[in-house]
Design a protein with these regions (language model features):
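Conserved glycine-rich cofactor-binding loop
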Residues: 15, 22-24
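Substrate-binding pocket helix/loop in short-chain dehydrogenase/reductase
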Residues: 104-106, 113-115
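Conserved glycine-rich Rossmann-like NAD(P)H-binding loop of the short-chain dehydrogenase/reductase
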Residues: 36-52
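Active-site helix of classical SDR
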Residues: 129, 165
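Residue(s) in the substrate-gating loop at a strand-loop-helix junction
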Residues: 149
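C-terminal helical subdomain
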Residues: 189, 205-248
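Active-site-adjacent segment of SDR/Rossmann-fold oxidoreductases
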Residues: 154, 175-186
Length: 252
């Protein structure tokens, strides 16, 4: 059931941090949260895109928006983000970063590059969950939403490190849900199989999935809306219309 705007603001406001907010599902989260009256911290590498989204949200919803231009794969990404957020009371942290820019066989990408993906999908997730979660627990309310992938459920050829790191985030989220659910802090994993974004369709093309550019996929807005509605019903959510494309040959 949907949480009324005033109740949602009280439980998860006044500030929400959306890591990976420049486009797709992250931008959809930002718009939906702004509509509910939450101030937003927008985090991504693309400062120009974030600036455009900031202007849109401020003008349309009369909220405050902070832009943080940050590569979340850097070793000090969480430290820099926390410094930028400062004393703003964050009641909701959404981690939506973490796509695989390589989509190659394991040995065809350097260990250094895999290390960056490991930091993006594991280290920064852990550090931010630790920092923001501690503050929420101290206040006795808040929410943590980890946007993951159905790829976390099993290994896939050309996605070895991606599936492994997404498995880490899935288990972290479910464990934190068990630890925090009786202490006022909601935790939800949103596992996305497919979504109608250019990034997803390009990845499907690289994986040689038939009709990757034309098949009907769930909309980013629908995924974000459902996740916010179900935030209090963790630990893990899959949109009912989001069925991961079968790539059995990729598992061989």
């Amino acid at each position: 059931m949907s949480v009324p705007d005033n109740a949602f603001q009280h439980r998860y406001g006044p500030w929400a941090v959306i890591a990976g907010a420049s486009h797709g599902v992250g931008a959809a989260f930002a718009r939906s949260l702004a509509e509910r009256g939450l101030n937003c911290v927008l985090v991504a590498r693309r400062g120009d895109t974030l600036a455009q989204l900031k202007s849109e949200l401020e003008q349309q919803y009369a909220i405050d928006v902070l832009v943080v231009t940050q590569d979340l794969s850097h070793p000090d990404a969480c430290e820099r983000l926390l410094a930028a957020v400062g004393e703003r009371p964050v009641g909701l942290f959404i981690y939506n970063a973490g796509g695989d820019p390589y989509i190659t066989r394991f040995l065809d990408t350097s260990a250094e590059d895999w290390g960056a993906l490991l930091r993006l999908n594991c280290l920064t997730v852990m550090q931010c969950s630790h920092a923001f979660g501690a503050a929420m627990l101290e206040r006795g309310q808040g929410g943590l939403l980890l946007v993951g992938s159905q790829a976390a459920l099993g290994g896939i050829r050309k996605l070895a490190m991606y599936t492994a790191t997404k498995g880490f985030a899935l288990n972290l989220g479910e464990s934190l849900w068990a630890e925090w659910k009786d202490r006022g802090v909601d935790v939800l994993n949103l596992l996305i199989g497919t979504v109608d974004t250019p990034t997803m369709r390009n990845a499907m093309v690289k994986l040689n999935i038939a009709d990757a550019l034309t098949m009907t996929l769930p909309k980013a807005e629908d995924l974000a809306l459902l996740a916010l509605e179900e935030l209090g019903n963790g630990p893990t959510l899959i949109h009912p219309e989001d069925t991961l494309v079968q790539v059995a040959n990729a598992r061989g």
